[in-house]
């Protein structure tokens, strides 16, 4: 969040102790606010009020020489705005991306693209593929870069909330792989069995790219209801029972870290490609998890 570059550096300085192989940089979609003009009239204003993903990625890469993976979204971006982001990243020699549809706007009940933007990540992949070939969104051509973008995509061990079934989810994941995705990062989960089952289902469907588990430590009692509602995932009964014994958030955080450590150890013992720790902007939490 927009707390200044020194706060960013403090966070990364803490993370460097663990020799991270890469750092993902999230992107926040633009949002709309409505200004009351009186007489029943409202003016809709589109706002971006956080430092740009490109700026954060460049700051980390240039200071620390750590691979950064900026997230590229359909959500809240037109095709031209996406092209501007790709041009800036290309100039900075930042070539690793995570390509996502992104979330609905806060006021939306269904996902709506921004202007001529995309409904699905696979459409965004096509724009990136064309960019790698030297083709702009308007069809004009540019010099092909010597360092093309490579990218991963998202996947959902407990099914995307909008997918009718897991088979449909796997069908579209395979399409994204065929379109050029080199790996996938999962939605967060708290039950490793669901990850292992999903990986086996993916293999059976002919999906053979690395599937990186996304892990988010549980840390507050309020997350007992917030996590299932926000991320559309289940919390295992054993985790819920332990959390309900907690008298405050400090105790809940300890339970969450212990659960996370157990998860990570089991995943690593099964030879996962890597671990993606989600929401680790609080630099002390990785210290506990380590």
Feature-to-residue mapping (PLM):
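Glycine-rich, proline-tolerant flexible connector loops at the mouths of alpha/beta enzymes
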Residues: 21-51, 105-113, 182-195
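Catalytic domains of carbohydrate-active enzymes, especially glycoside hydrolases
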Residues: 10-26, 178
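Active-site pocket-lining/capping segments in soluble small-molecule metabolic enzymes
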Residues: 102, 115-148, 153-163, 169, ...
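Active-site-adjacent beta->alpha loops and helix N-cap segments on the catalytic face
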Residues: 49-55, 79-81, 105-124, 139-140, ...
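Active-site beta-loop-alpha junctions enriched in small/polar residues
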Residues: 1, 26-30, 73-75, 102-104, ...
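Single conserved hydrophobic/aromatic residue that forms the stacking wall/gate
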Residues: 279-290
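Short, acidic/polar
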Residues: 3-15, 80-86, 164-175, 257-264
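Conserved, mostly hydrophobic/aromatic
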Residues: 23, 89, 176, 180, ...
């Amino acid at each position: 969040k927009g707390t200044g570059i020194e706060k960013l550096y403090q966070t990364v300085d803490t993370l460097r102790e663990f020799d991270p192989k890469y750092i993902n940089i999230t992107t926040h979609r633009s949002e709309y606010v409505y200004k009351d003009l009186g007489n029943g009239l409202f003016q809709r204003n589109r706002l971006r009020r956080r430092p740009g993903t490109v700026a954060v990625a460049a700051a980390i890469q240039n200071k620390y020489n750590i691979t950064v993976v900026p997230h590229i979204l359909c959500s809240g971006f037109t095709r031209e705005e996406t092209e501007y982001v790709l041009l800036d990243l290309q100039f900075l020699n930042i070539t690793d991306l995570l390509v996502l549809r992104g979330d609905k706007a806060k006021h939306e009940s269904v996902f709506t693209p921004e202007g001529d933007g995309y409904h699905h990540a696979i459409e965004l992949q096509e724009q990136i593929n064309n960019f790698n070939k030297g083709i702009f969104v308007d069809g004009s051509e540019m010099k092909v870069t010597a360092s093309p973008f490579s990218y991963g995509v998202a996947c959902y061990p407990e099914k995307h909330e909008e997918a009718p079934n897991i088979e449909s989810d796997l069908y579209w994941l395979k399409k994204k792989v065929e379109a050029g995705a080199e790996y996938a990062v999962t939605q967060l989960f708290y039950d490793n069995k669901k990850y292992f089952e999903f990986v086996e289902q993916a293999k059976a469907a002919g999906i053979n790219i690395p599937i990186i588990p996304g892990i988010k430590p549980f840390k507050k009692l309020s997350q007992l209801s917030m996590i299932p509602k926000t991320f559309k995932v289940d919390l295992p009964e054993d985790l819920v029972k332990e959390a309900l014994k907690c008298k405050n958030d400090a105790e809940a955080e300890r339970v969450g870290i212990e659960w996370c450590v157990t998860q990570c150890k089991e995943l690593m013992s099964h030879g996962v490609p890597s671990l993606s720790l989600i929401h680790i902007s609080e630099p002390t939490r990785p210290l506990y998890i380590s």
